[in-house]
């Protein structure tokens, strides 16, 4: 995907060696150097920009992180301020993030937990290198907790121990050394959610390479599908979903915010009125997803109301429409599901799915979807 390539590219430019085999990568690090020209382009990848803002504090010399205009409009200030509290020379200027690295003092830092869990993960990744270790205090409750739990699990695999409070509001990391390890990358529940939802809408779909015990927050799509009445069967490393008459649900998406477009389009054909809360952070994604979902569903004849932290969808019979994806991969894929149900739907900016799921349109066609790209 574009995001994976963005991360691979910037890591290579600071000295990380990545050898690709057919189904694995061998990564050799611990020899960071200043990138030629000092610039690292993170494309549209928020995770790459946020993680590298922290990692570049360990790189000797100056690094200048740049990204697409839409990504640079998204929040980064809380992470910069948290790093400054740890002694990092970092600033946000001239449409870039500039870090003068080479050493990390460490100490105690504070930041909000309700903007992006990636800020917390970024600090956890570098804290073992800090001379004084690192203590992270969150001034607001942590949202998207599962992704921080995944970070802690990953760190543990590489020999890093982190002490934390039960509510994940405080983290303590002593100075430690990463140990080489083998790490298995799970199948992505976020990408799989579209195919699983399609099964509930159109027939029967089985998705393989999914860990039913995963920590990934978007695994919650299974619970939502079951609550809506879909037939869901867990197999050996696979999930099967069968079409069913769907009913409305009320759901808190605080810890699985990326599922909003998916569950909203399911609600559009469900019997009754669904209410989704805990969605305020969805306004800070590649698009304002709350408003974008309302706009798209309204174009398809579905009654939708929005508040800052709530979306209410009344199910009906959607009609085909022209949908503006806003350049947002999750919007494009979610509305493709309704398009598959009702036909006559055009997704503008459909190429944006390459950000995380470049094979999406080919897979949709492969399972019987009537898809035509760019008039072809």
Name each model-derived stretch.
Residues 1-376:
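Short, structured segments at the rim of ligand-binding sites
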